[in-house]
Amino acid sequence: MIRRELAAVVSLLALLTMALTVPSSAAPRPLTVSTDKGAVAGATADGVDRFLGIPYAAPPVGTRRWQPPAPASAWSGTRSATAYGSRCLQSPTGTGPGMSENCLSLNVYTPEQRTNRPLPVMFWIHGGGFSSGAGDLYDGSQIAKANNIVVVSINYRLGVFGFLDVPGLSRQGAGNYGLLDQEAALRWTQRNIGAFGGDAGRVTIAGESAGGHSVCALLSSPPARGLFAGAIIQSGGCPSLTVAQATAKGEDFATAAGCSAPAKSVSCLRAKPANELLAAGSGFTGGILSGPLPVSGVPELPLAPSTAVRTGRIHNVPLLIGSTRDEVRQWALPFANATKEQYERAVGLEFGAQADAILAHYPYSAYDSPYAATYAISALWDDSSVFYGLGGCQYQNLTAQFAARQPRTYFYEFDDPHPPTLATTPAGFDSGAPHASELGYLWPMETSKLLTPEQQQLSTAMVRYWGAFVKHANPTTGGLAAWPSYRSGTYMSLLPGDDSQALKSTVYADRHQCSFWNSISYDGLTTNPDQLAAQAGVPTS
């Protein structure tokens, strides 16, 4: 069932991120820009210049599979940039451009009407568990036009193609090829964004979920120094694997792919067709809490990002960071049929000696619902941040660590109680504000079409807040509630209508019972929800 649950999460993200088609109210106007590799011809529609599918690195195929990204080759003449490039290989999700190993491209959106003064740049890194997603799922036209900024979205290698580490691979980039792709795209941006009207000195990296994890990793990566001036982390933490963990995971994949002999595994894997590797990679990419992650203890990530943040060894840039209020509620659905006894057994299995204290704070009886166990266990998971540190108390602590060194740190919680969702859930189940539910408020997606007038008002406000941060390293902007820094003792509660407001940080701490969680010792969740539910005896249907 874990595959089914993970597939539901990935499919939800894919559905959420189905970009709308280019508006047709204005005829596209062709235009040409010169890059360091050659000229590209994009098109203008509805006030936004769009340049799509521009290669920023050489195709990582053949002997370049599992190598750091190499420079793209120059081209003669003018290259068409009116269609998205291929998505990086992943399990099929939804519609869109085809998939290919030759996928290292990016997209640039810039306002048609602009002055000669270079514009700030928002550099977007997509989520999807480092296993799915693509830059084309995020149409940057709306954010670019509304804020008079440039938006860049990218593809990077995913799954076994982006995060494999096995003995025999060159230590340069092993396990972190996707992260190195992101850095290569940032270097392309530094070299070329001026030709598109952007300011290379004012690049803000931003991402959600795995994209947010990536932002934290880039903040911790010495080779990324100087490539950006600000950062936005949405529902992302700072997780990573050790080299030993990554190579063990890689060896399991090599065995599944029929390349178990250590001395020959790399040559064997490189000789495999990409589709065979993709088929063999389900164990590598699948499973909540068991998917690929960046690898630390290597030159591009000498320290685990969480350690780098805690000790201050990061690129000290302004930061906007936050999460949704109910990050993991939908991931707790394996407990939909759980009884009180099964819920309590699961908490005991996961938290051991701390279980009684936790159950006193999260009693089954607090939820008068057929889904009481799901609501109770998701609440304690949210508040304790046991899923990669997402949301809750560890997330507030992470923000405090950033803010201790960077005064321009801004914290939020997406608090819309009923955002649109395309996820399939049981009748009567309240998803709250789950993981990724804020995306349709910032980018034009399928869920964007379902926003109520009050939610649309929040969407407009969020687009403006994010744009203000990209432009000024401060999200406060005229006509909206002021957003003080975290150092002022406040965070922003994002609500529909005009109800968004800055609240005291103690409100967040009380909401998530942080006095309790900060008083006990516990580890992150090590058992995925399906397995934990099965161990507790919860029926599957």
Which residues does each PLM region occupy?
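Mobile gating loops/cap/lid regions near enzyme active sites that modulate substrate access
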Residues: 392-541
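Alpha/beta-hydrolase active-site loop
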Residues: 103, 173-194, 245, 251-252
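Short glycine-enriched nucleophile-adjacent loop
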Residues: 212-224
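Active-site loop->helix "elbow" adjoining a glycine-rich segment at hydrolase catalytic centers
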Residues: 127, 177-181, 209-212
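Non-catalytic accessory segments of hydrolases
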Residues: 27-176, 448-462, 473-479, 500, ...
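Secretory targeting and sorting signals
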Residues: 2-26
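Substrate-access "cap/lid" subdomains that shape
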Residues: 92-94, 191, 225, 234-349, ...
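Alpha/beta-hydrolase fold nucleophile elbow
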Residues: 196-208
